[in-house]
A protein has these predicted regions:
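N-terminal accessory segments that position/regulate proteins before the catalytic core
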Residues: 1-159, 166, 172, 185, ...
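Short pre-catalytic strand/loop immediately N-terminal to key active-site residues, enriched for Gly-Thr
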Residues: 176-184
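C-terminal folded domains that constitute the principal catalytic or ligand-binding module
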Residues: 188-193
Length: 241
């Protein structure tokens, strides 16, 4: 019997055939009248927000799609990825939680550079806090915008992609494992956001409207039981005058 979650995943996947309909749905949304919280009759008990290192850092977190025209170095990209590393090279203990220490979400990177040889498909190795080269790609800015279904200015340096491998977690938690997989990806996304918030030289933005199958092909994962969950595009910050 087919898992209903996979029907949901297939229904919500974006392809070159349904991306226009998805865009029309977004453009027709009334953002001025959206609901942002629940309402109850009693007034809330209000507490003063105490300052801490974490609270100061979270205030710096923001989504930016305006990049500078220079490229980040690989070491700068690694400043972001290192937020996902393991502790003491122990893969069951990392900087973010995972149900049953399954760590069913892997991180891949499409890096961009001035030279074609710098356009690489990379796998992030959390155990060694490093990247392994898988192949090269030939994506330009126009193609990147179409694959991400977003517009940006300037030059992005990398597209970080989170890919789920559900067999690692459903074998223990059955269909409930899909929820845990999405929670894990969300925790990873937050780690990336906080890592970027620490730097004045790096900017970035979460990307949710990815073309699933096309990106999985670029990652050479189209034959695997893998699910493209979400991504994060990063680049050099625009220099202030």
């Amino acid at each position: 019997m087919r898992d209903p979650f996979l029907d949901f995943w297939e229904e919500s996947s974006l392809t070159k055939y349904n991306i226009r309909e998805y865009g029309s749905k977004m453009s027709g949304f009334d953002a001025d009248n959206k609901e942002l919280k629940l309402s109850y009759p009693k007034y809330p008990v209000v507490f003063k927000n105490k300052k801490s290192k974490l609270s100061l850092l979270t205030k710096l977190r923001k989504s930016v799609r305006n990049f500078g025209n220079s490229y980040l170095s690989l070491s700068q990209i690694m400043q972001v990825l290192t937020q996902l590393s393991s502790k003491e090279k122990d893969l069951e203990h990392r900087t973010y939680p995972s149900a049953g220490a399954s760590y069913c979400v892997e991180t891949f990177v499409l890096s961009f550079g001035e030279k074609q040889s710098e356009n690489k498909v990379l796998y992030y190795d959390a155990e060694h806090n490093g990247v392994q080269e898988i192949s090269n790609h030939d994506l330009n800015n126009n193609r990147i915008e179409k694959l991400c279904n977003i517009s940006f200015s300037g030059t992005p340096s990398a597209l970080i992609l989170f890919v789920g491998f559900p067999d690692r977690i459903t074998i223990k938690y059955s269909s409930r494992g899909y929820r845990f997989m999405l929670i894990e990806a969300g925790a990873m996304l937050q780690q990336i956001a906080l890592g970027i918030a620490q730097s004045k030289k790096i900017s970035g933005c979460p990307v949710g409207g990815l073309l699933d199958d096309e990106l999985l092909k670029i990652l050479k994962l189209e034959q695997e039981n893998s699910l493209l969950i979400t991504g994060y595009i990063i680049g050099a910050s625009v220099k202030k005058p």
